[in-house]
Amino acid sequence: MSLTITKDNIFPKGYRGRLTEGVTYDERNNTLLWVDIIQGEVHRVFLDNTNINTNTSSSSHETLKWDSSNESIGAICLTNDPNKLIICSKYGLAYGDFSSSTIEYFFKYPHTTNPDEKLRLRSNDGIIDPWGNLWIGVMNDFPIGAKEGIQPEGKLYRIGFSKESNKLTCDVMIENSLISNGLCFNNQGDEFYWTDSLTFKIWKYDYDKTTNKLTNKSVFIDLKQFYPDVEQPEPDGLVMTNNGEIYTCVFSTGTILHVDNQGKEIERIKIAAKRPTCVTIGSGIKNNEMFVTTGHLKLDDEKATIDAINLDGDLGGFLFKLKVDKDLNGQKKNIWGGKV
C-alpha cells in the first residue's frame, strides 16, 4: 500500500515556515527540532506535550533566532547537552543554547577570510559522523543564486576536534559542488553518501577514517532515471536506515523516494507539498514515525504572507508527521564529539 502525507499529517499545527529544513529527532528528551533557513530560526517542540496538537501557540514550541537579517541556518547538530546545538550558519558554526536563548559563533569557515567567498556562500545540509566530527556543505547564498544561478563554488567541509587541546581542524572533502545536500554514512562507517542536488544524483564514496579520504566515487541513484518526465528532480535531505535503505526528499516532485541499499526503488511517498526538503525517522514506541519538512511555493518572495491557517492548495512550509505500522529502523543522530 502506497503512503500519502496530507493536511491531516501537519505537525505541529499552527506553525508554517518559509523554507523548513534540517529536521532532527533527539531521543534523549523526546524533542523534534528543525530550521527555517531563510528566517534564520531553529525550532524545538517536546513531543510528549499534548499542547502542540492545538492550533494555538504553546510553551512547548521554542525558537532560537539570529538577530541579523544577513544570517541563515542550513543545519543543526546535537551536542552532549540536549539544550545546546551546533547551528550551521552563514559564516560558520555557532552554539545555540535553549537555556539562555542565545546563538554565538565559535568557528568561522576558512573561505570567510576571502571577502568575495564570505559574501557568496552559506551553510546548507550537514551531519555528525560516527566519530563525532561535523560534515557541512556550503553553497551560493540566496541573492547570488537568484542573480547568477547556482555556480559550482560549493564545498563540503569536515570539522574535526582534539579533546586534549580543544582545537578544531577543517578539511575540504569535496570542492566545486552546486548544492551540497543530504548526506550520511552507513553503519560500518566505510561508505559515505552525498547529494549534489543540481546533478540530480546521490553519490556514493568509500571512506577510510584512518586517512580521512573519500575514494571510488560512483552514482548511487540518478533521479532522472526515476523521474524521466520531471525537468529538475532535485534530491534534497535524506535519512538512512540501519540496513542501508535511503529515504530522500525529491524537491519539486511532491514525493519522498525510498530505495534499498542497492539503489532500487521500494516506494514513493506522496506529500501534499511540491517542495519536500528533509526527512527523519524517530519517536514512537516502535520507531514508527517519520517527520518531513517542506518549502513554501513563495519562499523567494519576501513580501509573501506565510499563512498557517489556510490549508487550501500546496502545503509547502508546513511540517508533517507520518505514523506507520512498522519499525522504520532509522539511524539515530550522532553527537558532536568536541567540547561545548
From Swiss-Prot:
Signal peptide from the UniProt entry: none
Short name of any one Pfam family annotated for the protein: SGL
SUPFAM superfamilies the UniProt entry points to: Calcium-dependent phosphotriesterase (SSF63829)
GO terms under biological process: negative regulation of cell growth
Bridged cysteine pairs (disulfide): none
GO molecular function (one): calcium ion binding
Matches recorded under InterPro entries: 6-blade_b-propeller_TolB-like, SGL, SMP-30
Family the UniProt entry places it in: Belongs to the SMP-30/CGR1 family.
Described purpose of this protein according to its UniProt entry: Involved in the cell growth regulation.
Protein name: Cell growth-regulated gene 1 protein
Organism field: Candida albicans (strain SC5314 / ATCC MYA-2876) (Yeast)
Gene behind this protein: CGR1
